[in-house]
């Protein structure tokens, strides 16, 4: 069965707002190396509309191992307002998003990656569809803003399965669900 892997940047205090102000840029060598490795074991992206629109504006004009991979792989967009996603190999998820993602997990293939897409992540979390979290924890404290995990979630047990530290002190922590 395919896994759903959430890969998100987060501050030390768990915030995810204004990520472009404090996270590594998409062309940083360490960023590219680690995300290219993640994508080499994946064949699909699960994206919310806002993340999709940002990615679709940035990646199609770039080339290299990471942009070429992200441009060619399947992209599944959870949106009720985006009618015709134009980025190569993009598909809008229609109807019940958690049900559609559960069906995608059952299909043969490699893992599915969720980048950003805060609302989509929470919908998948509420339906126990996330298998792994790859959190890029940055040495920044915002003190306010939207948290990665919303208040009121049920307790979840996770296992830390990998740690990597890259300059400038970013800890990449990989957790798997204990279910």
PLM-predicted stretches and their roles:
Residues 136:
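Non-cysteine beta-strand/loop elements that form the S-adenosyl-L-methionine
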Residues 1-129, 139-179:
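Portal/gating segments that form or line small-molecule/metal binding sites
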């Amino acid at each position: 069965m395919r896994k759903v892997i959430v890969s998100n940047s987060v501050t030390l205090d768990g915030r995810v707002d204004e990520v472009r102000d404090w996270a590594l840029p998409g062309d940083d060598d360490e960023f590219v190396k680690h995300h290219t490795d993640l994508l080499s074991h994946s064949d699909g992206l699960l994206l919310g509309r806002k993340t999709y629109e940002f990615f679709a504006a940035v990646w199609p004009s770039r080339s290299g191992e990471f942009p070429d991979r992200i441009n060619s792989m399947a992209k599944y967009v959870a949106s009720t307002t985006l009618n015709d996603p134009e980025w190569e190999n993009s598909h809008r998820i229609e109807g019940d998003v958690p049900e559609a993602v559960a069906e995608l997990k059952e299909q043969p293939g490699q893992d599915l990656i969720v980048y950003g897409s805060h609302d989509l992540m929470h919908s998948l979390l509420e339906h126990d569809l996330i298998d792994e979290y790859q959190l890029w924890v940055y040495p920044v404290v915002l003190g306010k803003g939207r948290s990665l995990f919303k208040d009121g979630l049920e307790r979840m047990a996770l296992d830390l399965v990998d740690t990597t530290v890259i300059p400038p002190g970013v800890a990449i922590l990989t957790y798997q669900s204990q279910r």
